[in-house]
Swiss-Prot record:
Top-rank taxon: Bacteria
Protein species of origin: Aeromonas salmonicida (strain A449)
Protein name (Swiss-Prot/TrEMBL): Sulfate adenylyltransferase subunit 2
Pfam families: PAPS_reduct
Role, per record: With CysN forms the ATP sulfurylase (ATPS) that catalyzes the adenylation of sulfate producing adenosine 5'-phosphosulfate (APS) and diphosphate, the first enzymatic step in sulfur assimilation pathway. APS synthesis involves the formation of a high-energy phosphoric-sulfuric acid anhydride bond driven by GTP hydrolysis by CysN coupled to ATP hydrolysis by CysD.
The protein's Enzyme Commission number: 2.7.7.4
Quaternary structure and partners: Heterodimer composed of CysD, the smaller subunit, and CysN.
Length: 309
């Protein structure tokens, strides 16, 4: 659990050390200021970094708040295995919530589409969990470089009693001073990784030796190409039509979510240094393979206004 210090004087921090210090400061601030915070755990690389930072923030003590995973029932099998192993390894207080109404209706991305699936299983599921446990602050692993609606979001993102985000009703954050005042029923979404980039995340994972889901590394996997996007066949629920051709291809994932809505990329990067080298050369967004971002123009901002993370 040591900080990155190799080759750096005590008087000057590297940019990763500065980002680490800022994130730890934010995490400690939230733990001190709010009555009932929670950390969202989506099992992806950003969540893994955020969890690592939370463990550092309170080491050698335990993390003083629970983790919450909103499970849509359509995550990659390797993600669920990794989630359970991580919770057991670190003795985490992990809450897993599935929207019971969505499960009863049989909501799934193949039949109902990405928009309805995301709204019911993720957005409504998240709001259910936050209301059920009375959380007044929720950490998220979003970064400003990911997507334009996230680029204009504050570190402390104010949400009303219906968990809605109004970009015009946010608070100034001058000199890293954060306003944590909320009325009963209101909440704050907190983003400690706001100032990190995708490359920062990968370099930090490498330097700190952070465990991540194996799906981020290239391997031969069964994929079906639909609308130019390679979808991995993760279980028997994937409908395979006569026109579909399942191919074994060397692919990996830059971002993870529900497997029917997450596209793989062709890659031979099987190690962290190879992924970092690939990131230095790429000219495309990491979210190019997320189908929920392509529902319609401004779809991510609309989802956030409705309560999505």
């Amino acid at each position: 659990m040591e900080s990155i210090r190799a080759g750096v004087s005590r008087e000057r921090l590297t940019h990763l050390q500065q980002l680490e210090a800022e994130s730890i400061h934010i995490i400690r601030e939230v733990a001190a200021e709010f009555e009932n915070p929670v950390m969202m755990y989506s099992i992806g690389k950003d969540s893994s970094v955020m969890l690592h930072l939370a463990r550092k923030a309170f080491y050698p003590g335990k993390i003083p708040f629970p983790l919450l995973h909103v499970d849509t029932d359509w995550k990659f099998k390797e993600m669920i295995t990794f989630r359970d192993e991580t919770a057991k390894k670190y003795g985490l207080d992990l809450i897993v919530h599935k929207n019971p109404d969505g499960l009863a209706m049989g909501i799934n991305p193949f039949v109902h589409g990405s928009g309805k699936h995301t709204d019911i299983m993720k957005t409504e599921g998240l709001k259910q969990a936050l209301n059920q446990h009375g959380f007044d602050a929720a950490f998220g692993g979003a970064r400003r470089d990911e997507e334009k609606s996230r680029a204009k979001e504050r570190v402390y993102s104010f949400r009303d009693k219906s968990h809605r985000w109004d970009p015009k009703n946010q608070r100034p954050e001058l000199w890293r001073v954060y306003n944590s005042q909320v009325n009963k029923g209101e909440s704050i979404r907190v983003f400690p990784l706001s100032n990190w980039t995708e490359l920062d995340i990968w370099q930090y994972i490498y330097l700190e030796n952070i465990d991540i889901v194996p799906l981020y590394f290239a391997a031969v996997r069964p994929v079906v190409e639909r609308n130019g996007i390679k979808i991995m066949v993760d279980d028997e629920r994937m409908p395979i039509g006569p026109e579909d051709e399942v191919k074994q291809e060397l692919v990996r994932f830059r971002t993870l979510g529900c497997y029917p809505l997450t596209g793989a990329i062709e890659s031979d990067a099987t190690t962290l240094p190879e992924i970092i080298e690939e990131m230095l050369l790429t000219t495309s967004s990491e979210r190019q393979g997320r189908l929920i971002d392509h529902d319609q123009a401004g779809s991510m901002e609309q989802k956030k206004r409705q309560g999505y993370f």
